[in-house]
Amino acid sequence: VSHIQAYLYQNGIVYPRYIIEDFFALIQTNDLIILAGESGSGKTNLIKSFAKAVGGESIIIPVKPNWTSAEDLLGYYNPLEKKYLSTPFLDALFEAKRNPDIPYFICLDEMNLARVEYYFADFLSLLEERDKDNPPEIKLYSEDESSHVSSELKMVLSLIESTKKNLDKNHIEDYVGILEDKEVNQELRRVFGFSDKNSLIKYHSDLKRMLSGILNTPASITFPKNVRIIGAINIDETTHYLSPKILDRAHIMKFDSPLLNNWVAIGDEVKINENSHLKLKFKIEDFGERTPYPSFDMEDDFCKQMVDLTQVYFSPLGVEVGLRTIRQGLHYKKLFSIFNADDNLAFNNFLVHKILPKMTFDGSIKIEIKERGLLTKKDILNEFLEKILEIFKNYRNNNGIDAVRELKSIIKNSTSNEDIVNYWA
C-alpha cells in the first residue's frame, strides 16, 4: 500500500492511505464494489490510478439511462443475422480472458443512471458463486444456435465435395476456383436451390460472418479470475436509488470531496524511495480468490455483536441484515487486517459499506417493542447512535468516512425532512 501511494504521488495523484487500504481490501473480496460520491470526487480516477500502479488495465463503461435488461450489459444473439451483437462490457470480459495474467478493473460508470437491478441483477447473482475451482459461467445464447451454424457449414462442405466429385472437378481446391468454374458454379446454385437473385459470393460471405460470430463470441464465457467489477454512482435528481438486493450484495465505498482532505497529513504519509516510480507486479491471486465467505460463528465477537445490533436496532428499523451481510463483514475484516490492524477502523468501514446505506425509512412510524414500550423509528435510530458511540468510546477515527459522523448527519437531515430517514438524501 505504501508503494502504491508513493507511486501515485509521484505521478501527481494524491490519495490518503486509508482509501487505498480500504479499496485494496474490497478488491480482494471479489464482491461488487460501488464507489459513491459527488461528481469529481475521484471515484473513476481511483480505479484508473490503482490499475496503473499494480500493472493492470482499467476499462470504464458508461451506463446509459435507457438500459433496461441484461442485453444492454452483455449483448444478445440476433437470429436473423445469426450473429451475436456484443457490448463494450462483454468485449472487456473477453479481453481479460485473453490476458489471464493481467488484472482487469472494469468500471460501470454512473451505474445508477438506469435501474441497476434491471440490467445487472442476473449478473450479480452469478457473482454470488464462490468456488474458486468452478468460476461462474455466463450464458450468452443457446448452444443450439452455434450447433445450427456448424451443421450448416458441414452440409455446405459436403455438397461442394460431392458436386466436385460428380463433375470430375476434384482439382478445384478453393472457393475462388469454384466461382470461376461455370459448370460447378451452376450446379451448386441448383443444389442449394438458389434463385436468379442469389449468388454463391453472398452465401459464402454470410457463412463466413456466421462462423466468425460463433468463434468470436461462444455461447458462454466463464467469468475471468483476473476481473473485478466496480460501479461508480452519483446521487442526484437524474439517478436512481440502489435496490435492497443490490445493497445486500455490494460494498458501498463513499467518497468525500478531495478538497476536504488534509493535504499536509497525506504528504507526511507518503514514503518516497528510489523505486517509487516503478509499477508493482502482482499475481492474480494477490487480488483475492473467489472462495466461500467465512462461516458464521456465534463464538466470534463480531458475529455476536452483529446479532445483538440486528435484534435490538436493525430489525425494528426494517434494515435487513442477514447471514450473508455478517459473513461478508467477517471476510472484509480478515482482508483489511492485512493492511491495517485497527479493528475499530475495520468495523467503522463495515458500517459505512454495508449498514448505513440501507437506512431509508419513515422515522415517524411507531413500533411496540417488548420491555422498551412504544417507540418511533427515529427514537430507535437515536438509540443506535448512542450504542455506536459506546462501542467507539475509546476510539477516534481520523481516517476517512466516520460512521458516527455519517449517522449524526442522517439523523440531522431527517429532522428537516419530516423524520424521513434517507442515507442517500
Identify the residue ranges that each predicted region occupies.
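AAA+ P-loop NTPase catalytic core and its hallmark functional loops
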Residues: 1-284
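Alpha-helical lid/collar subdomain of P-loop NTPases
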Residues: 265-425
